[in-house]
């Protein structure tokens, strides 16, 4: 996934495009995962952030998906907190 993108547009549950600000990208080598953290672009005061997993199909096309596995989410949350503490 292109790492220099500041904003991305994603489809919400209703099929409408919503613009998100990219907070950070990071990789977790232990589980061979790549992740992106985004927040709604139109609400700068929003404390809500979404962590999405980057997956690739056989042709190399990338898609962002929610993290369903609780253990994976816990690892991702720990890695995100580490990344953010290093950026401060």
Curated annotation (Swiss-Prot):
Pfam family, one: DUF1292
InterPro entries in alphabetical order: UPF0473
Highest taxon in the source lineage: Bacteria
Family membership: Belongs to the UPF0473 family.
Protein's recorded name: UPF0473 protein CLH_1128
Protein's organism: Clostridium botulinum (strain Alaska E43 / Type E3)
Lineage start: Bacteria, Bacillati, Bacillota, Clostridia, Eubacteriales
């Amino acid at each position: 996934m292109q790492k220099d993108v500041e904003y991305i547009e994603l489809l919400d549950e209703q099929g409408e495009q919503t613009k998100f600000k990219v907070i950070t990208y990071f990789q977790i080598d232990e589980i061979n995962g790549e992740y992106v953290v985004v927040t709604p672009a139109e609400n700068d005061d929003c404390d809500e952030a979404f962590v999405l997993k980057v997956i690739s199909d056989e042709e190399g096309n990338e898609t962002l998906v929610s993290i369903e596995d609780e253990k994976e989410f816990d690892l991702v949350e720990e890695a995100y907190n580490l990344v953010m503490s290093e950026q401060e």
